Each structure stands twice: as structure tokens, then as C-alpha cells.
């Protein structure tokens, strides 16, 4: 099993992962199902992970196996506050938007079951399509840190949003190693089927 990051982007998987280790769409779907079931058991116990990302899962796209690791950031929502708020790119926008507030500030959004669900949706999207749902062509600020905070937080906008193309990926700016997965026009998220489309719509649009 390998760190999930290797299978999260077109550039990484196309340049560094041997063809015989990439698995199939079906095996990666099984991988995602196992992660989702693991999170469901965690939530059923009244816990939240708070830092689910490709760095905190080990995956095997060949067999479709997966396991969640680095669960030292587990929280009990409302009782045991988190020590971490998550990994950039997987933190729910509402959590990132209030990260500067103190833990006891009533306006601060803390990691909980629903923010885990956002991270899970991002993880499934990246594993199946090899691109990030919020990493589009829009530059929100010339300062890299501010740009990230806006991209994943206050200005988070799905790259395949049906009515707002502000953050659409510019295919002519993609490198050869990022194709075809990096171009949503060639591989739209709808290829994942109606059930996952509904999940992605709820996570990134609704």
C-alpha cells in the first residue's frame, strides 16, 4: 500500500506511477468505498477525524484496498476540541474561513462530521479523476498564501460548476503529463455516474 498522494493528481500518476500499478477505475472506486466505510464507522462512534486527506490514507489501486491512518487528530465534536484543523485542500471552506478565530469563539467553525464529509468528497474526486475539485484556472490573489486561503475557503468554487465558469481549468495551460485527466472537458465528473455526481454536487455546489 502507498501514500494516497501518488494517486491524487494527473501529473504524479502519469509521471511517476508505473502503468501496472495504477489500477483501474473500478479498483479505485472500491478503494474509495473502503475509505468511506471507515469514516462511517468512525462517525457512528461519535468521532470526527478532523484531518482526512491523501496523506492520511494508505491505498492499493490494484486490489482496491485502503486504510485510514494518522488518526491522532480524532475529536469528539462539542466536547473534545481538535488539535489540527486539517490539510490544505481538504479543509472544509467554512473551517478555513474562520481559522484565525480563537477556539472558544462562537463564530469559529471546528472540524466535525460534516467537515469530514467534505474532505471525503474531495478525496474521492481526486482518486477517481486525478485532479482537485477546487484547483482551477482562477488566481484569487497574487500572494500564494492568500490565494490558497481564498481558493479553498471564502471563494471556494467548483472547477466544474454548471453555471459559474470563473474557476474553470484552462486546458491550454496544462502540461502534457496532466492530460487527459486534468481537462474536465475531456473527462467530466459526470463519468463517475449519477450517484457520485449527486455527492459531488452536494459537496461542491449546493
Predicted regions and their residues:
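Activation segment/activation loop of eukaryotic-type protein kinase catalytic domains
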Residues: 55-100
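Conserved hydrophobic alpha-helix
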Residues: 35-42, 124
